[in-house]
Amino acid sequence: MEYLKLYTLANNQAVIATNNERRFYSYDTCVCVYDYDKQEFTLSENESHFSRTTVKWLNKFLAGYDTTYQSIKKIARRENLN
């Protein structure tokens, strides 16, 4: 079963990845990266319909939140994404 996982990285990035290849954060499992300047998720280079839909949903979901690095971690824990 495929699922999404939100990784909050030490360099103030949040990365959404999938487990579709049974690997955790790596180039080819990365779906999108959170841009703290734009305050939105952007697609990684391996764009697909799945990741476009995911990015739209995530940006809509996070629209009402304070999306600082720490709050992204809290949202992830509360929503069981992390």
Language-model segments: which ranges?
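Terminal leader/tail segments of proteins
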Residues: 1-82
